[in-house]
């Protein structure tokens, strides 16, 4: 990805964060976790935007599976003096470094990694979830419906349909757990084909109908999503 496209992505993500600022308590330290932070362009930008520009009392934790990347990010945060920004090697499913989190962020967490991040966010009671999914392979492997053969018979259409069905189900499952959700265009397709963002804000009002809708769709399409199973545990 070129620098210009990455810059556009980060700016767009910060716009989504600006929209949810009223959900964050400015008088109390807010904990934010960025799962699959990679080289942490977004993580550093979030810290600067929220801590330096907006004056929020925040702690940001970046998690990634790559040891060398985490070491590099920690060197940078020391260089810039970002004391409440920390990076750890690991995955969100097994991370136990905090008891509660105010906001969970994922940018292109691949396939079911997004599901583990969303499930963890729900269990933490996160007030805000911002997730840009990536590579929804799970549903694509099992999805089937003879009435949709004009779509299913063509690989690229099946892949896109499976991705849309997966993200729609994820949004509905979050609603079933007491979140108000939106699926928004993250950035123009010109810059990345992975251009949908799931934004969820906690309301504390579970929607049982939303869960039933996912159940019905899963049965019709022959899919069994990881997020659904994780939230049932």
Model-found features: residue ranges?
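Conserved class I S-adenosyl-L-methionine
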Residues: 28-38
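Conserved SAM-binding loop of SAM-dependent methyltransferases across substrates and taxa
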Residues: 39-55
């Amino acid at each position: 990805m070129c620098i210009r496209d990455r810059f556009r992505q980060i700016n767009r993500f910060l716009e989504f964060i600006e929209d949810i600022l009223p959900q964050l308590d400015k008088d109390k330290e807010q904990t934010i976790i960025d799962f699959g932070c990679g080289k942490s362009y977004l993580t550093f930008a979030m810290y600067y935007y929220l801590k330096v520009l907006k004056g929020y009392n925040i702690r940001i934790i970046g998690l990634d599976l790559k040891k060398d990347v985490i070491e590099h990010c920690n060197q940078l945060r020391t260089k810039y003096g970002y004391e409440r920004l920390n990076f750890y090697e690991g995955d969100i499913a097994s991370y136990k470094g905090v008891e509660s989190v105010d906001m969970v962020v994922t940018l292109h967490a691949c396939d079911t990694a997004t599901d583990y991040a969303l499930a963890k966010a729900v269990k933490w009671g996160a007030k805000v979830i911002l997730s840009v999914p990536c590579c929804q392979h799970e549903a694509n492997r099992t999805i089937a419906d003879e009435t949709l053969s004009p779509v299913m018979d063509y690989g690229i259409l099946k892949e896109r349909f499976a991705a849309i069905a997966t993200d729609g189900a994820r949004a509905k499952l979050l609603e079933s757990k007491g979140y108000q959700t939106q699926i928004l265009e993250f950035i123009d397709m010109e810059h990345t084909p992975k251009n949908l963002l799931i934004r969820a804000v906690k309301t504390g009002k579970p929607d049982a109908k939303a869960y039933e809708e996912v159940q019905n769709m899963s049965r019709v399409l022959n899919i069994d999503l990881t997020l659904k199973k994780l939230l049932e545990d």
